[in-house]
Swiss-Prot record:
Function: Transfers the 4'-phosphopantetheine moiety from coenzyme A to a Ser of acyl-carrier-protein.
Keywords annotated in UniProt: Cytoplasm, Fatty acid biosynthesis, Fatty acid metabolism, Lipid biosynthesis, Lipid metabolism, Magnesium, Metal-binding, Transferase
Cofactor(s) named in the record: Mg(2+)
UniProt name for this protein: Holo-[acyl-carrier-protein] synthase
Originating species: Nautilia profundicola (strain ATCC BAA-1463 / DSM 18972 / AmH)
Magnesium recorded as keyword: yes
Catalytic activity: apo-[ACP] + CoA = holo-[ACP] + adenosine 3',5'-bisphosphate + H(+)
Length: 113
């Protein structure tokens, strides 16, 4: 299952400027907030979570919320979905790629059940 999402970094930046950390807490877990040092990073996580939900076939909603999906980073900074997230949705393997360019963040996700 494949999911892709793109988001304007300025959209996330505007949310953060308007609502502060409260905005981040609507779509990021505490551990993720510690990893996001910029609007660019936050936008990448937003796109990754949207892409995950699309690959799952549910979209963001009652079956799969932003806070149900948790992202971490390895020692080299590569993002990945936590084991907790994979177990919650019965996913055997997940691949995640996030990129930023031209004012946008994009994420691609492949899930195997």
């Amino acid at each position: 299952m494949i999911g892709i999402d793109i988001v304007s970094i300025s959209r996330i930046d505007e949310m953060i400027n308007k609502f502060g950390e409260k905005a981040l807490k609507r779509f990021l877990n505490e551990s993720e907030i510690l990893l996001t040092k910029s609007s660019q990073n936050a936008a990448g996580f937003w796109a990754a979570k949207e892409a995950f939900s699309k690959a799952l076939g549910t979209g963001i909603g009652s079956e799969c919320s932003f806070l149900d999906i948790e992202i971490s980073k390895d020692q080299k900074g590569k993002p990945f979905f936590t084991t907790k997230t994979l177990n919650k949705f019965n996913i055997k393997q997940a691949d995640l790629s996030i990129s930023h360019d031209g004012g946008f963040a994009i994420a691609a996700v492949i899930l195997l059940k």
